[in-house]
From Swiss-Prot:
It is found in: Nucleus, Nucleolus. A motif (DEAD box) lies at residues 174-177. This is Probable ATP-dependent RNA helicase DDX47. The gene is Ddx47. ATP binds at residues 68-75. Residues 1-21, 412-455 are annotated as: Disordered. Keywords: Acetylation, Apoptosis, ATP-binding, Helicase, Hydrolase, mRNA processing, mRNA splicing, Nucleotide-binding, Nucleus, Phosphoprotein, RNA-binding, rRNA processing. Its main location: nucleus. GO terms for cellular component: nucleolus. Involved in apoptosis. May have a role in rRNA processing and mRNA splicing. Associates with pre-rRNA precursors. Belongs to the DEAD box helicase family. DDX47/RRP3 subfamily.
Length: 455
């Protein structure tokens, strides 16, 4: 066969298809010029795999089921077709996006507003934890896009005079598997009954569970499936490790890793709100720029933590699983599972915070004597044996005394904070990220810890 005919071979054809995918632009997908310019301004040089799959079909008016790994550009895959359609037929209350969490709702709103800034797109975020009256006023202005959690949206549909979605053209269910796992099925059913049947529906999910399949049958008409990753797959450029350590030395090993990989951004997952707060205080006492994000914080403080981390004002975000899905934090270099997830699928979503959209990243999971069975389930789920993260145990043990001292002061601060909350429920200050307790931190032997350069 001649050299110029080589693409006719199976391997040559695959290579050509991959090269074509690499060179595709948003314009090639059918996105209008004004939105292509918005993509350029956001630094979206080229579409991701899920965008290449989903956008042309969505622009043809098809219902879409999008299955893609976390961090694959799912928001752009549904936002661009919706904005494209809005440009052609401008209308208020044009699209509804349902999400499982408040944080994800704000993230999606930011992307819609950024992409649609030049065409004057107006969004309303309708979530719990925020005053209903201000949301009612926002809905009265009839925004183009409503981004909502199901529970609060039902509240407004039932109680906000004059608000309805009878003219809705697009419905998006993002992180649909999680919406259903959080027992929002009843609310979703109610919403489906009060919106037009003649609409376009996009369902995006990390996994195709039985509940999602049931929802697909109820909500979508002749949908096209766009899948760019297999079930429970972790992204290719993610380096995954584990550390088998005694439970009592978890804090010490965490400090060692933060020093060894200094200069990176970290997302550290803890199992409880209390442990998240305690570990954040411990790390601050040792001079690290750590900030917590958990469900016991107010909505404004949670968004404050998230924004400081996104702006790189803080390099370490400690979070419960409330932050493990859907949040747009593109610069996480290392994920640490400080507490191993109880549900194996949560491992996929946690480590999906790094190695996003083609970048590389590390994930390190702490395994104690109590976690062996959970860890084996994770390895079985992802279909691979993880290597051990290399450590120098002698160097780790040298940190023990100072870490123990920082632990004591962290516990003291937690107690003081708890007593203060009892005395004064309304706390106007930003206790979750103030640089206070300076006296306590200065007592930690040696002050700030010397950090090594990252590997």
């Amino acid at each position: 066969m001649a050299a110029d005919e080589e693409p006719d071979s199976p391997s040559g054809a695959l290579q050509t298809a991959a090269e074509e995918e690499e060179t595709k632009t948003f314009k090639d997908l059918g996105v209008t010029d004004v939105l292509c310019e918005a993509c350029d301004q956001l630094g979206w040089a080229k579409p991701t795999k899920i965008q290449i799959e989903a956008i042309p079909l969505a622009l043809q008016g098809r219902d879409i089921i999008g299955l893609a790994e976390t961090g694959s550009g799912k928001t752009g895959a549904f936002a661009l077709p919706i904005l494209n359609a809005l440009l052609e037929t401008p209308q208020r209350l044009f699209a509804l996006v349902l999400t499982p969490t408040r944080e994800l709702a704000f993230q999606i709103s930011e992307q819609f507003e950024a992409l649609g800034s030049s065409i004057g797109v107006q969004c309303a975020v309708i979530v719990g934890g925020i005053d209903s009256m201000s949301q009612s006023l926002a809905l009265a202005k009839k925004p183009h896009i409503v981004i909502a959690t199901p529970g609060r949206l039902i509240d407004h549909l039932e109680n906000t005079k004059g608000f309805n979605l009878r003219a809705l053209k697009y419905l998006v269910m993002d992180e649909a598997d999680r919406i259903l796992n959080m027992d929002f099925e009843t609310e979703v059913d109610k919403i489906l009954k009060v919106i037009p049947r003649d609409r376009k529906t996009f369902l995006f999910s990390a996994t195709m569970t039985k509940k999602v399949q049931k929802l697909q049958r109820a909500a979508l008409k002749n949908p096209v499936k766009c899948a760019v990753s297999s079930k429970y797959q972790t992204v290719e450029k993610l380096q995954q490790y584990y550390l088998f350590i005694p439970s009592k030395f978890k804090d010490t090993y965490l400090v060692y890793i933060l020093n060894e990989l200094a200069g990176n951004s970290f997302m550290i997952f803890c199992s409880t709100c209390n442990n998240t707060q305690r570990t954040a205080l411990l790390l601050r006492n040792l001079g690290f720029t750590a900030i917590p994000l958990h469900g016991q914080m107010s909505q404004s403080k949670r968004l404050g933590s998230l924004n400081k981390f996104k702006a790189k004002a803080r390099s370490i975000l400690l979070a419960t699983d409330v932050a493990s899905r859907g949040l747009d934090i593109p610069h996480v270099d290392v994920v640490v599972n400080f507490d191993i997830p109880t549900h194996s699928k949560d491992y996929i979503h946690r480590v999906g915070r790094t190695a996003r959209a083609g970048r590389s990243g590390k994930a390190i999971t702490f395994v104690t004597q109590y976690d062996v069975e959970l860890f084996q389930r994770i390895e079985h789920l992802i279909g691979k044996k993880l290597p051990v993260f290399p450590t120098q145990d002698e160097e780790v043990m040298m940190l023990t005394e100072r870490v123990n001292e920082a632990q004591r002061f962290a516990r003291m601060e937690l107690r003081e904070h708890g007593e203060k909350k009892k005395r004064k429920r309304e706390d106007a200050g930003d206790d979750d990220d103030k640089e206070g307790a300076i006296g306590v931190r200065n007592k930690v032997a040696g002050g700030k810890m010397k950090k090594r350069k990252g590997r």
